Design a protein with these regions (language model features):
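Residue-level detector of flexible, active-site-proximal loop/helix-junction positions
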Residues: 5, 30-33, 57, 84, ...
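Rossmann-like NAD(P)(H) cofactor-binding subdomain of soluble oxidoreductases
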Residues: 1-38
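Short, flexible, solvent-exposed loop/turn segments with mixed acidic/basic and small polar residues
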Residues: 38-44, 139-140
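Conserved strand-to-helix beginnings and helix N-cap segments that scaffold or border functional pockets
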Residues: 9, 35, 60-64, 153
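Internal alpha-helical scaffold of NAD(P)-dependent oxidoreductase catalytic cores
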Residues: 42-132
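Interdomain hinge/lid region at the active-site interface
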Residues: 113-182
């Protein structure tokens, strides 16, 4: 179970297979920015997607056992290659986490934190909630998935550059279309 699969499959997949141990990666797409037993939830996996990565081609019977486990705790399962998993989660989890932290840093760097606390509302809270996740864990996730994260980050920087150009040019229509497409 974990947020990055490629490095795990590379490091242990073939070794375990040679030793006769079945290895299938699992990543339930569920979680919270909160840590500790006091924040445990019996509903955490309800209706969540669990990604199974079977790059070592473990026999279908074993894969189905693992799939049934995840289904019994409430997940529905999909299968994909580790590289596809890492690329996908970079887009929908890792980059959003980094951008959430960026929003916090951008708001606080040089700003009046007391005033900002008074005027911030739901949009800021919703955008920055995930940045409250455990920093050491997230640093590890981002670093382990660096190739996919860097590719997505370059795409995000390119789009931010375009937004900056539209703002500098006063191009409200381009901004409107970009926001509408989101």
């Amino acid at each position: 179970v974990g947020s990055v699969k490629g490095c795990v499959h590379q490091a242990v997949g073939s070794v375990l297979k040679k030793a006769g141990v079945a290895f299938i990666g699992s990543h339930p797409m569920a979680g919270s920015e909160k840590q500790g037993m006091e924040h445990a939830s019996g509903d955490l996996f309800r209706d969540a997607t669990c990604i199974l990565t079977n790059d070592e081609h473990v026999h279908e019977d074993v894969l189905l056992l693992l799939q049934r486990f995840w289904e019994r705790v409430g997940c529905h399962c999909i299968r994909m290659k580790a590289a596809d998993h890492d690329s996908s989660v970079a887009r929908i989890s890792h980059i959003p986490h980094a951008l959430s932290a960026l929003c916090v840093h951008s708001a606080l760097d040089g700003g009046d934190t007391k005033l900002l606390g008074l005027v911030s509302a739901g949009g800021f809270r919703d955008t920055t909630r995930v940045s409250m996740g455990e920093p050491s864990m997230w640093a590890e996730i981002l670093a382990e998935n660096a190739p996919a994260v860097l590719e997505r980050l370059d795409e995000a920087l390119s789009q931010l550059g375009q937004v900056r150009n539209w703002l500098a040019a006063g191009d409200k229509e381009a901004l409107r279309e970009w926001l509408k497409a989101a």
